[in-house]
Amino acid sequence: MSIFKVSMTAINPKDESRRTPPVEVLVDTGSENSWMPRALLLDAGITPRGKKRFYMANKQHIEREYGYAILEAKGHETNDEIIFAESSDMSLLGVHTLEGFSVAVDNVSQRFIDIPAVPVPANVLA
């Protein structure tokens, strides 16, 4: 697991002129999803589409809303689910977003390393 901070922006996919201000998030390879403050997402016009349940490290179960946004950090962007974080939650950049960015995480230098996307051969799908 690797954790360090970067600045991330969420862009409204229906109106790309609407976006959050840059938010300092933890790059957390132990977290599946990316989380940003609820109020900032709503201000950017990003709307909740449903709810997800999470089992936290402290053994607590919580439920949070999620929506869809274009996420941008360190010159990379991807369309992804974003969790609407409450004030008690951390802002996170999770592995699903990292995969969308097509990057690996360098723990030592705390940076992203570009990796090529690997296509699946058609005969594997047959």
Where are these regions (language model features)?
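Pepsin/retropepsin-fold aspartyl endopeptidases
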Residues: M1-A126
